[in-house]
Amino acid sequence: MYKIDVLKQYRFPTYDPRMRFCPENIVWFEMARKYKMRVIDEAVRVYYHDAVNSLMVVKNVRRSVSNYYMWLYYLNNLSRYVIYNPIFILKAYVGVSMDGFLSGKKASSILYSCDSIIKKLFVFCLMPLGYILNKINIK
């Protein structure tokens, strides 16, 4: 099977019309469920944070909407990897509320999006931290 055929099977989802981009992690993790991937730990691209139009520095609503769905995907599909990388999953629990608030979602809507009671409880407990980070990012 050719790479292009595999890529055609996994389309980039658009959960919200305000999304400017779909985080590629979502597609790559879905692909990894079916196919084995090899990773080469070598830098192939350099991102500069000091550019005026840098996507990595700007915090806007459309980016927050995309990040919200990325964090939500991590919580609902990758929580079983908490043993291997607990910091990664903790960031997702905080990030889902932070970017949820930045994109205009209510707390009840954020909690409703989690697929289990335990995940909802963790998100609820870390929601104040996400709210504080939301207020810091607005400035």
Predicted segment positions?
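Conserved nucleotide-sugar donor-binding catalytic segment
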Residues: 1-58
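Acidic/histidine metal-binding catalytic segments
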Residues: 21, 86-89
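Membrane-interface aromatic/basic loop that binds lipid-linked glycans or pyrophosphate carriers
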Residues: 97-139
